[in-house]
UniProtKB/Swiss-Prot annotation:
One of its GO terms (molecular function) is pyridoxal phosphate binding. Homodimer. This is Aspartate aminotransferase. It catalyses: L-aspartate + 2-oxoglutarate = oxaloacetate + L-glutamate. Belongs to the class-I pyridoxal-phosphate-dependent aminotransferase family. InterPro entries: Aminotransferase_I/II_large, AspAT/PAT-like, NHTrfase_class1_PyrdxlP-BS, PyrdxlP-dep_Trfase, PyrdxlP-dep_Trfase_major, PyrdxlP-dep_Trfase_small.
Length: 391
């Protein structure tokens, strides 16, 4: 279509930066024999019982609107889930069903932040947080996550970042992109800080079931229920990224206000998808599949870490969560972006530059092991060969 006129675009949209991850994927899509270690989604298919539940729901007529906050039975299933897995008591009024954790975090930013508010966001961090803050006309304030501190926030630095304008702290553990996990003591410390300063915690927890070795997950609603907005998703846990199903757990007053915005943004999540969500949470078959996925991820994690440790110019801190490794590549003498571009051209392997997640990501790349062992081994062979050739 030939366009003759210049179109007006809202300034808040123009402020949003295009993801560097997508740019790299587009380049890779034009090349042959590329192995992608960049994708942030499970390579597994959704468990069969969940798919069958969606099919039955369609046949049973679940093709109409639902209550904006979600089908009551699914909200009840979320309540049961937190009691069963964590011993945490919440009410149905504390839950809204969303189009993935993406919408959940968006609703949190839009419902709770105003122009001039400050939101403390880790650096590096998942790409959407800073952009969501801009759309909400809030100011992102970055707090560094350092390798020497296991990619965890320093409580003293957190206190230094808090001002009279601070409205929210964002945390995400198990972490994307670093694979770090949050220990109980630090989780409680962050909760105490939020309560002392009357600040919201937006805790994004979609990788909660993919933790390894001695790591444990502690939902932030356990420590600061009155201050925490917990965003979660079926996408990673049950390999349901394309279904767009998630939820938020928060104080009932916050959920009530979020639901008003949610009603005008999407109305409700597709009804048959919500029925599948009930099956996912309540079926033992679903949880057996999750355990199988976790076992496979752990085996892949070990393969990648072991191989990277023996490569020239690479240092790696062993991650205990999610499905990412965040190796330090500064020993290669290349920047994160240069290394990622070089690796794509030289080895036909996609990794994500750490700077896609913030300034503190310089000197690192994100590697996803959410792909088959065969592809991972071949990718490691290619990376090692390319690095050996640079020595």
């Amino acid at each position: 279509m030939r366009e003759k006129r210049k179109y007006f675009i809202a300034e808040r949209v123009l402020l949003i930066k295009r993801s560097k991850i997508r740019e790299l994927f587009e380049r890779a899509s034009k090349m042959e024999d590329v192995i992608s270690l960049g994708i942030g989604e499970p390579d597994f298919d959704t468990p069969k019982n969940i798919k069958e539940a969606a099919k039955r729901a369609l046949d049973e007529g679940w093709t109409h609107y639902t209550p904006n906050a979600g089908i009551p039975e699914l909200r009840e299933a979320v309540v049961e889930y937190y009691k069963k897995f964590y011993g945490i008591d919440i009410e149905v009024e504390n839950v809204i069903i969303t189009a993935g954790a993406y919408e959940g975090t968006y609703l949190a930013f839009e419902s709770l932040l105003e122009r001039g508010d400050e939101v403390i966001i880790p650096d590096p961090a998942f790409v959407s947080y800073a952009e969501d803050a801009k759309v909400a006309e809030a100011k992102p304030v970055r707090i560094p996550l350092r390798e020497e501190n296991n990619f965890l926030p320093d409580p003293n630095e957190l206190l230094e970042k808090i001002s009279k304008n601070t409205r929210m702290i964002v945390i995400n553990y198990p972490n994307n992109p670093t694979g770090a996990t949050l220990d109980k003591e630090l989780a409680k410390t962050i909760a105490d800080i939020a309560e002392d300063y009357n600040i919201y915690i937006l805790s994004d927890e979609p990788y909660e079931h993919f933790i390894y070795e001695d790591a444990k997950h502690y939902p932030m609603i356990k420590f600061a229920p009155e201050n925490t907005i917990l965003a979660n998703s079926f996408s990673k846990t049950f390999a349901m990224t394309g279904w767009r199903l998630g939820f938020v757990v928060a104080p009932s007053q916050v959920i009530k206000e979020m639901t008003k915005l949610h009603a005008y943004v999407i109305g409700n999540v597709a009804s048959f998808v919500q029925i599948a969500g009930i099956e996912a949470l309540r079926s033992e078959e679903s949880w057996k599949a999750v355990e199988e996925m976790k076992k496979e991820y752990n085996e892949r994690r070990k393969i990648v870490v072991k191989r990277l440790k023996n490569m020239p110019g690479i240092k790696v801190k062993e991650p205990k969560g999610a499905f990412y490794v965040f190796p330090n590549i500064s020993g290669t003498g290349m920047s994160s972006e240069k290394f990622s571009e070089w690796l794509l051209e030289k080895a036909r392997v996609v990794v994500i530059p750490g700077t896609a997640f913030g300034r503190m990501g310089e000197g690192y790349v994100r590697i996803s092991y959410a792909t088959s062992k065969e592809k991972l081994i071949e990718a490691m062979n290619r990376i090692e060969k390319a690095l050996e050739g640079e020595k």
